[in-house]
Amino acid sequence: MRTYRSQAAAWMLALGLSAGLVACGSKGDTPQPTPKPTPTPQPKPTPTPRTFEWATCDVLIKEGHDHGHGNMHGNNVRRGLFYAQEQRFTLRNDGGGKVTLTWEDKLKDMPYFQAHQGGALFGMLFTFKDVKGKRVNDVLTELSDHYQIFFTIAEKDATGAIHEVKDLRTDKPIAWDHYTKAKPSIPTTTLEQRTKAIFEYVYRDTKDPYYEMKGDGDAKDHLLRIPGTQNLNKIGMKGHFKFLDRDWDWDEKGSPSQLASFYLKISLKQSTGPKFFKHDQHGLISSESYQPEPSIQWTTVFEVLLPVRVIANKRDLLKYPARYWNDMARAFKKTPEEMKENDETSEPGNDDSSFHM
């Protein structure tokens, strides 16, 4: 009996020790798995937009007149007229952002954009082509969230030398103070202000880049819009210029407007992200023609300098006709009498042109 109790006690003691060991071992002696840290979320890289590939570009400059609300109607081409109402040049993509400009043969003696002040509009149409000669404006339209053509006054010529805007009559630098003294006064301190003093450009890109507008009424249905808005998606394959005479009669003594001679810098730029930005009043918009939005990262696809000469002011025809014919004679190296006779004996003008923009 005594032996049995001793064995039972020893057995109970062993159980207690075993339980104690197990209990002690459960208080942290067993290695625990190290928790994996939560990975830090990485910013998603901005996808690189598709690049626009082109080989050549045919450009048409078409003279016209204003039909209101941004609509331009082309003038009919009058046979026999010295003055070219349609002007053409070609751009060739030489790679690396370099472009060669070649004027059509009939303009080889006057290789520059011949423009007028006094209300005339000048449409400019770009037709891009690939190496096989196929038109690719539709490709640029598909990529239009990232591409825009800008137009401004060049501050340097093709050699990199400083180039000032000059008055064609005097061949001297433009007197910018004529604009500031005019009524209303026009500021001309910055390049942006000077560009706006010399010309205006209106974008007229269409959903189908090859669509030819048939009149003023259908323009609003065919213009290219920013998705989800009625704001214009500005590319620059179609648009028109108006050259301004805001310094006309600047001294209230009948002084003429200055006729600007300058290089128009045409730049196709690509944005890293979407080119649209939010305006406080107008919502999502595109940049103005003379100023790429600074908050957006841009790269230049190509840049070309187009020589422009404003050869005369049509407004002078009404009040100062001798001045107008003298200016035209200077541009074409004729006498004023020859220029006037050419205008009177050439095919008369009419308003039947099918060209609308």
Locations of regions flagged by a protein language model:
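Extended, solvent-exposed segments with strong compositional bias
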Residues: 170-250
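Bacterial N-terminal signal peptides that target proteins for export
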Residues: 1-12
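Bacterial Sec-dependent N-terminal signal peptides
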Residues: 14, 18-57
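N-terminal edge beta-strand
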Residues: 75-117
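Short beta-strand elements
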Residues: 278-357
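N-terminal segment immediately downstream of the Sec signal-peptide cleavage site
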Residues: 41-83, 356-357
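Internal, hydrophobic beta-strand segments that form the core of beta-sheet-rich folds
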Residues: 122-128, 233-292
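Extracellular-facing segments of soluble proteins and assemblies that are Gly/Ser/Thr-biased and enriched
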Residues: 108-201
